[in-house]
Every structure is written in structure tokens, then in C-alpha cells.
Amino acid sequence: MEEQNQYTSPEYEGFKQKLRKIIGLDLNSYKNQIHRRVHMLMDRWGVKTYDDYFNTIKNDDKKLREFLDHLTINVSEFFRNDKQWWKMRDELIPELIRKRGNKRLKLWSAGCATGEEPYSLAILSAVCGLDASTPVLAADIDQGAIAIAQKGIYLKRQLLNVPQEYLAKYFTTRDGGETYEVNAEIKRRVTFKRFNMIDDAFGNGFDIVLCRNVVIYFTTATKSLLYVKFFNALAPGGYFLVGSTEQIFDYKKMGFEMAGPFLYTRK
């Protein structure tokens, strides 16, 4: 069977429908390379049919986690693209505090993966003196990734961008310095939630939303839908940050204004 025919076959359509039913994931929203990753995993496990592969990931948490991991290339670290983070710390958060007249800002890491991004946001929240009673929302479709994030334990190489003063203040060393654990103060500043950004309703009134290196895997139509939802989730004057390889081409049609590289705002 040719590759394209496999992707449009009734068997593959049935696989996608059942997958959406059990984990809320719509593969129709993903680019075509996702299909190749499905076949790569089927080959790895020696599974010949879509029905057999569906039953495999339905009944084996390890294989389901591997499947979710392979939908995207999960490269995550603290303060990734650090210039964005220091702009948030030095300009955006202080500006929002002045505009709002208080330190209760709503912050959201959408597609939080294993937690490096929301914990980075929580550290800046502490550094800037934001009210800890308004935690950072961290949302992801992968419950396995969320479980890892909630533990808050990371390898040294994931912390290369963390300033030494933050490392000393907000982390505890483990295993002779090979791993680090986020301290309790920062953990309390983050609320994790399983979330399907395609199907689930977004909240609103957010001051800063980060969705970096997630939307790039979706089709153009799904991207546009999501960007509109993110715009509506922002409070007036709020900021939306995307990844360093991303650009919203029709941002003006969606209501955004560009506020800097990979940075958009709702006026």
C-alpha cells in the first residue's frame, strides 16, 4: 500500500476517530509528517494494522506516552531563547504591574511539556514580586509530561540558561549535583492542567501567554483558529509570545499588534 493511500484509507480514518475519542487528540489538525511518525512507531513495535496499534497505545501507558512524545519534537529547557525571558523580566512584567495597578497578573504556559517553561515563568513571577496567590497556569495534552513536570526534577543540562543566583535560590541539588529540583515556593506558583488546545475552551483575561514551538506542528487552518483563540484569551494590553522560528503572518487580521520579535500584543 502506498504511503498517501495509507493516510487517506478508511482504516487510518478510523484510527484517528478512535484516538480522538479516548485522548481528545485530532490528528487531522496536524501536518502530514505526523502520519510518518505514526508509521515509524508502528514499525518499531512490530504492529501491522491501525486497529492493533490503537489497542496497543490504549492499553499501555508507556507506548501512549511514546506516541505523544513523537507527535512533536520535545526540546525543552529553562529560559529557552533567554532574551525573551529577560525582556519579560525587565520590561513586560514591570509595565503590566504599572498598568494593572497591582501584582496579580495572570500568566499561562500553553503546551507546557515537562515543565521547564512554566517554572521559568514562575521564577520570574517571584523575582518581579508578583502575588503568589495567582499561580502560573501550565497546560498540556500529555498527562505523562504533566506528571514529570509536577515532580520538578531536571538534569543539569536543562538548566544551562538559569542564572547562578536563581539556581542557588530556587533549586535544590540532588544526586551529587547531577540533577536539580525546583523548590517548593516555585512549585506552589504553578498549577498544572491537562488541556487540549484545539477542542477545549480557553480562559480569558491573561496578561502574558506563552505558546512556543507547539503551533508549528499544526496545519495552517488550525494555526489560524488557535491564534484567534489566544488573542481572545488575552486581556487588553496583554502579551502573546511565540517561538523563535514562528511568525503570525496575518496578525493584524486577528487583532494583534506586533510588539517585538516573536512578541504580539492585544491593544
What residue spans do the PLM features occupy?
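Short proline/glycine-enriched turn/loop segments at secondary-structure junctions
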Residues: 251-255
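Conserved beta-strand signature within the Rossmann-like core of class I S-adenosyl-L-methionine
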Residues: 237-244
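Residue-level signal for inorganic ion chemistry
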Residues: 88, 209, 234
